[in-house]
Amino acid sequence: MLFRSRLFEPDCIIALGGGSAMDAGKIMWVMYEHPEVDFLDMAMRFMDIRKRVYTFPKMGEKAYFIAVPTSAGTGSEVTPFAVITDQDTGVKYPLADYELLPKMAIVDADMMMSAPKGLTSASGIDALTQDRKSVV
């Protein structure tokens, strides 16, 4: 996907899916706009997003990022966070910066009303888990 995006140089990147798809879209957006970045440098090593040691690159200069969630739970379509997993080591690297906020989120409540009950209940549990993590 990243290779193809560099070939046709889109002015808009749309992520459609759940939280993992949103995170993958954000990562692809970063890699498209700033192929020189090192994710180990960008990985969150701090407790407060405002007190970071790494200056995140300016986003949105080549393409807008639009998030279209198909499930509820992570809230990735409206948060400045993304998680990338190193396939070789299995280590997850959280990225956090307000530059990762999508330009727009298109949320269709009817989509959840017509989703399978299993997806809806799993999304609800995920949303509850995300909520509880903020308290811990």
Located regions from the model:
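Glycine-rich phosphate-binding loop signature in dinucleotide/nucleotide-binding domains
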Residues: 5-11
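Short glycine-rich or small-residue beta-strand-to-loop segments that form or flank ligand, phosphate
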Residues: 13-16
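A glycine/threonine-rich phosphate-anchoring loop and its flanking beta-alpha core
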Residues: 35-134
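DPxDG-like acidic metal-binding loop motif
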Residues: 23-34
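Acidic-aromatic/histidine active-site loop/patch
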Residues: 19
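Short, small-residue-biased leader/transition segments that mark boundaries at the very start
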Residues: 1-2
